[in-house]
């Protein structure tokens, strides 16, 4: 008989509400005692959430950064929560034990996964509570992306109160393009989003839309008023070119370079620097958008036009990574590289031709089944699930965000269900 794999072990677990003793010990000593103070997090309440104390309920939040557990759970202590966390994180050695000990729900992002839904429903039935970040992945741009498909249906099915947090300053503390934290300030608003009676009277689509509207936040716009200084030791823009790859002046793709507090185009010299308030300050004679988020959306508009051209394709050599069947990933790796080949996106979907484990290997995912990708850490690589198996791509160029945007916009152009925010679509239609 073959040895049972880590994947089989993980998906064979029957989860239960987390141990109150362990949760409160970690919550009070480590999170409240150390991390909340370290990140200068402050909590305000727009509703009386104490009336729900001890009941089963769900907390949702905008997914500002990789540190969001520090900014959500403390708002509701002494209540305890099971978190919903990306499936792949359970295979990383520095996280594997704590995630299992805390009865964390493993979720395969952006794909249907009945196991995760069953475990969430079981935890709620047994009197537990869940913290869920419905975007599925931490913010890339500094603002939200639409919540993952099915979020409204899930909340309606659970049928318990839905409370929320809205995090301001979380992205600027831990931006997607850089793994070094920048300490400044984080403001967290907590309140009540839905009562069970409200959920019962709403359609899943209405719930989903209200989730998107209530949780939307733009950290760059917030800091225009808040004026919080974030300390990055002179490296505010390090790796920012991986996120902002398009030059807003000459239109060059993958022509941006960054380092220290500077970002500029190798092709035309257009550039500037990012100060400790995240203000984009153009060099003399240069042209830059108002904020990095505005730049990001302009870049998306460029990619949207590109993918709608007849015969569009995007192709690149990539290395292929998978999760280990036995044991865990060490040195904070996110996958084991087991192959390589050519990845291609077109109007039909995503194609791969190459090798895996020394053997020829190929796959195809129809574009309507591929709304977006995940990113485990920063903007250096991306992943999806192929026939249920985590598959990570390491591109030769700094092109991860190009792949993300091109796939999302192709999915939308071909009638996929994961569309952009309605208010952004309306703005685009108005030109």
Residue ranges of predicted features:
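Short, compositionally biased "basic patch" segments
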Residues: 2-23, 68
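Soluble catalytic domains of membrane acyltransferases
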Residues: 19-27, 36-209, 226-227, 233, ...
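Anionic N-terminal interaction surfaces
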Residues: 282-342
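A conserved mid-domain beta-alpha-beta active-site/ligand-binding segment of alpha/beta enzyme cores
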Residues: 205-243
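Short amphipathic C-terminal alpha-helix that caps PH/PH-like domains
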Residues: 98, 204-219, 399-418
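Acidic, Ser/Thr- and proline-rich intrinsically disordered linker/docking segments
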Residues: 364-431
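Cys/His-rich short segments
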Residues: 228, 232-287
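Phosphoinositide-binding peripheral membrane targeting modules
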Residues: 326-380, 391-397
């Amino acid at each position: 008989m073959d040895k049972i794999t880590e994947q089989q072990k993980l998906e064979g677990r029957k989860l239960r509400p987390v141990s109150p003793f362990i949760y409160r010990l970690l919550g009070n000593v480590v999170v409240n005692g150390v991390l909340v103070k370290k990140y200068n997090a402050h909590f305000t309440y727009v509703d009386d959430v104490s009336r729900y104390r001890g009941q089963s309920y769900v907390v949702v939040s905008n997914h500002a950064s990789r540190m969001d557990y520090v900014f959500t759970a403390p708002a509701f202590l002494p209540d305890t929560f099971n978190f919903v966390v990306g499936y792949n994180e359970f295979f990383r050695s520095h996280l594997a034990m704590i995630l299992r000990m805390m009865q964390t729900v493993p979720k395969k992002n952006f794909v249907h996964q009945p196991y995760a839904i069953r475990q969430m429903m079981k935890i709620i039935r047994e009197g537990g509570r869940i913290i869920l970040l419905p975007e599925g992945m931490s913010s890339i741009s500094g603002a939200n992306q639409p919540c993952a498909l099915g979020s409204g249906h899930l909340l309606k099915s659970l049928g318990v109160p839905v409370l929320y947090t809205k995090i301001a300053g979380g992205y600027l503390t831990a931006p997607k393009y850089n793994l070094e934290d920048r300490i400044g300030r984080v403001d967290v608003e907590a309140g009540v989003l839905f009562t069970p009676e409200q959920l019962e009277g709403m359609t899943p689509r209405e719930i989903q839309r209200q989730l998107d509207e209530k949780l939307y936040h733009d950290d760059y716009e917030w800091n225009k008023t808040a004026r919080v200084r974030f300390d990055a030791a002179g490296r505010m823009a390090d790796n920012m070119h991986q996120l902002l790859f398009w030059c807003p002046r000459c239109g060059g793709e993958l022509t941006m370079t960054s380092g220290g507090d500077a970002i500029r185009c190798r092709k035309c010299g257009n550039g500037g620097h990012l100060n400790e308030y995240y203000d984009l300050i153009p060099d003399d004679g240069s042209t830059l958008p108002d904020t990095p988020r505005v730049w990001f959306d302009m870049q998306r508009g460029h990619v949207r036009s590109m993918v709608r051209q007849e015969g569009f394709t995007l192709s690149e050599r990539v290395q292929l990574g998978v999760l280990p069947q036995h044991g865990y990933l060490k040195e904070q790796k996110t996958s084991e590289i087991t192959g390589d080949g050519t990845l291609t996106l077109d109007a039909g979907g995503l194609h791969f031709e190459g090798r895996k484990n020394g053997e020829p290997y190929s796959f195809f995912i129809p574009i309507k089944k591929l709304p977006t990708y995940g990113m485990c850490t920063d903007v250096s690589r991306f992943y999806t699930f192929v026939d249920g198996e985590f598959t990570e791509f390491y591109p030769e160029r700094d092109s991860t965000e190009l792949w993300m945007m091109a796939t999302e916009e192709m999915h939308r152009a071909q009638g996929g269900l994961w569309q952009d925010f309605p208010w952004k679509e309306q703005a685009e239609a108005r030109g």
